[in-house]
Amino acid sequence: MTNSIDGPKGWQARAAAWELAALSFRYPGAELAGAVASGEWAEAAREIAGALGLALPKGWADDVRDVELHALRAEATRLFVGAPEAACSPYEGVWRAKAEGVQPLLFVNPHSMAVERFCKSCGLGRPEGTNEPLDAVWTELELLEYLALRAAADAMDAAAENDLAAGGDGAPTEEQAEQYKEIGDEIDEFDTEDDGPEPGDVVASADLPGGSPEAAWDEFMADHAKVWMPQFAEACEADSRVPFYKQAASLLAAFIK
């Protein structure tokens, strides 16, 4: 995303964008199927896009609601798992290997390993109970969500400090306090879901890559997400036989610009 939105609300909108995108590409469950069928998914996408200053085409996602969970799962399997290979691999290492003209290998390729090191430097590890590469599109999107939440929290702290410096009391309004709690609760969820080296501990902002959540977010976007996700989104939109995945891919493409 290259829009100029900043501040706590801007970072919260970015976090919401990545959260929705990650949910869209993970193996579908009842939560996703229900949100798609009810129209909640498309409504959330439009709201988030609007908050980020992005315009979705008229009639976007009008055709996604008439789909059942079994159809989503069948298409997700065909696209992202496949036999003998996925129609549209969800792994950065595979896309980067193809671009470099080398044999793609899961886990043991330089790009997958770089993503794993980056996650660890942010205090995050492989989601508990899983053994999948950390360069899966949904995992990378969740990392970006986490960094955006951290940036939102830091922006609120900075606003309070600026208020104090200007002679105010630094106390948040009721709305700001509720916003801060919401951000904190979402950050805490990451500590309970991964098996990082220090479960329950959050890496200090100054110790994140680049010295801040914003810098870490920019670095991961430049070195990883923007390098391969546009091509992944384009392929997914072209290859999918189910309208939902076509629209999810077009949404990811809009978010990643």
Regions found by a protein language model. Name each.
Residues 1-257:
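Surface/interface-facing alpha-helical segments and adjacent flexible terminal/loop regions used
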